[in-house]
Amino acid sequence: MATTLNPSEISDLIKTRIEAVKLSAESRNEGSVTSVSDGIVRIFGLADVMQGEMIELPNNTFALALNLERDSVGAVVLGDYESLREGDVAKTTGRILEVPVGPELLGRVVNALGEPIDGKGPLGATQTAPVERVAPGVIWRKSVDQPVQTGYKSVDAMIPIGRGQRELVIGDRQTGKTALAIDAVINQKGTGIKCVYVAIGQKASTVANIVRKLEENGALAHTVVVAATASESAAMQYISPYAGCTMGEYFMDRGEDALIVYDDLSKQAVAYRQISLLLKRPPGREAYPGDVFYLHSRLLERAARVSEEYVEKFTNGAVTGKTGSLTALPIIETQAGDVSAFVPTNVISITDGQIFLETDLFNAGIRPAVNAGISVSRVGGAAQTKIIKKLSGGIRISLAQYRELAAFAQFASDLDEATRKQLERGQRVTELMKQKQYAPMSIANQALSIYAVNEGYLDDVPVNKLLAFEEGLHAHFANTQGELVSKINSTGGWDNDIEASFKKGIEEFKTTGSW
């Protein structure tokens, strides 16, 4: 028997079904992928995309819009691009790239996107911040007048670094650039300065070794390691310094002090050159794109010392009366000591000074291999501790005179007494500037060594016994005048009483002959 349906029932059922459907209008800007090659995607149809915007691709993959052309967009993929195909849907997100920030990152190793890669579980960070940010304006900045101690006598005495300064570390490969920066990070233990170490284009084994050394020396607890290793894409190597800078700025904005090491910006420039050439941007000098100067200047200008007003405004009054700082130690690798190449000259002109490390000095056993003649700190002098500033003036003069006379003495057979004394003093100063790796020196010990050589107490000590003498002298003062050593380390002051104590202590130690 056929079933009969009442037309009114059918219409009621249809009405009920239509009313139950929840429709929402969503405006979405979509395009389609036209090509994928070498980490670069070309997308057709994204009319409203912004420069630097995140573009969503299938399989939870994102790309960064870099080239906005008349009818297509050139974007660089952040992560794996093997699964992308021509015709895939690309969507705009309306967001720019952000990374996690906060104290939760201290002691962790993350990639350029802020994702943990150390196997210690999730970060637990609750805040994020954009990787690109405009540097603090002139009105919000304060002059650099507080020191960052690296623990190296040669640097702290002759090329002092201040909080908020940008000091370039430049030299050929295998001259101790990373060692100097890592020792500076280790020396911040107990000072309250938070550190960020950005490894760009390095071997994964090298990064693992650095992390292990930081852990062994108790420095990982105050350090964030951002790693974009050689096996990662050019996009990750390009982004990583900006991500690390954002993590450091978190502390600066809240009235704290931070130190960031970019190791090294030469590899970032190479990664950016690769991206630019793949995006068909016109090449310039050494095939770098025209904006390679801006690549580094916008990064390094974010390192600053900001005023109390800036911190108060940023924290909405939660933090008052405190200045913040971000000190940058960018590293540049030169080829055969050529500091006049494109990227080195760019970074030299952006920074507030440079520490030049030389292969010949390194091979001669003078480590750190600092060339005191062409190394300079343009603003750090105002930040030097009183005691080091007072004592270190003679060091530079002794070394400059020694270099001049040493060249002359090669041709002269008979030297007068004054010249011979200057040569011997210069030899001792050069020897005294040597220092072992992972052994940063306190302010008091540095001052003691410099005072001893300046006042001629080392003139009768054989050059090959100098470092043993220095070690014994430091131990003698730690045992007999521990209170004075602690006072100098905490205040950095200098007066006649301290000078008298130094004089008496050194003379006492010399009589023991225990070196």
UniProtKB/Swiss-Prot annotation:
Keywords linked to the UniProt accession: ATP synthesis, ATP-binding, Cell inner membrane, Cell membrane, CF(1), Hydrogen ion transport, Ion transport, Membrane, Nucleotide-binding, Translocase, Transport
A Pfam family: ATP-synt_ab_N
Enzyme class: translocase
Membrane topology, record value: Peripheral membrane protein
Subcellular localization(s) per the UniProt record: Cell inner membrane
UniProt site (Required for activity): 375
GO molecular function: ADP binding; ATP binding; proton-transporting ATP synthase activity, rotational mechanism
GO cellular component: plasma membrane; proton-transporting ATP synthase complex
Binding, ATP: 171-178
EC number assigned by the record: 7.1.2.2
S-S pairs: none
Gene3D superfamilies given in the database record: 2.40.30.20, ATP synthase alpha/beta chain, C-terminal domain (1.20.150.20), P-loop containing nucleotide triphosphate hydrolases (3.40.50.300)
Catalysed reactions listed for this entry: ATP + H2O + 4 H(+)(in) = ADP + phosphate + 5 H(+)(out)
InterPro entries named among the record's database cross-references: ATP_synth_asu-like_sf (IPR023366), ATP_synth_asu_C (IPR000793), ATP_synth_asu_C_sf (IPR038376), ATP_synth_F1_a_nt-bd_dom (IPR033732), ATP_synth_F1_asu (IPR005294), ATPase_a/bsu_AS (IPR020003), ATPase_F1/V1/A1_a/bsu_N (IPR004100), ATPase_F1/V1/A1_a/bsu_N_sf (IPR036121)
Family assignment from sequence similarity: Belongs to the ATPase alpha/beta chains family.
Subunit structure as annotated in this protein's UniProt entry: F-type ATPases have 2 components, CF(1) - the catalytic core - and CF(0) - the membrane proton channel. CF(1) has five subunits: alpha(3), beta(3), gamma(1), delta(1), epsilon(1). CF(0) has three main subunits: a(1), b(2) and c(9-12). The alpha and beta chains form an alternating ring which encloses part of the gamma chain. CF(1) is attached to CF(0) by a central stalk formed by the gamma and epsilon chains, while a peripheral stalk is formed by the delta and b chains.
Entry function: Produces ATP from ADP in the presence of a proton gradient across the membrane. The alpha chain is a regulatory subunit.
Protein name: ATP synthase subunit alpha
Organism the protein comes from: Xanthomonas euvesicatoria pv. vesicatoria (strain 85-10)
Taxonomic path: Bacteria, Pseudomonadati, Pseudomonadota, Gammaproteobacteria, Lysobacterales
Gene that encodes the chain: atpA
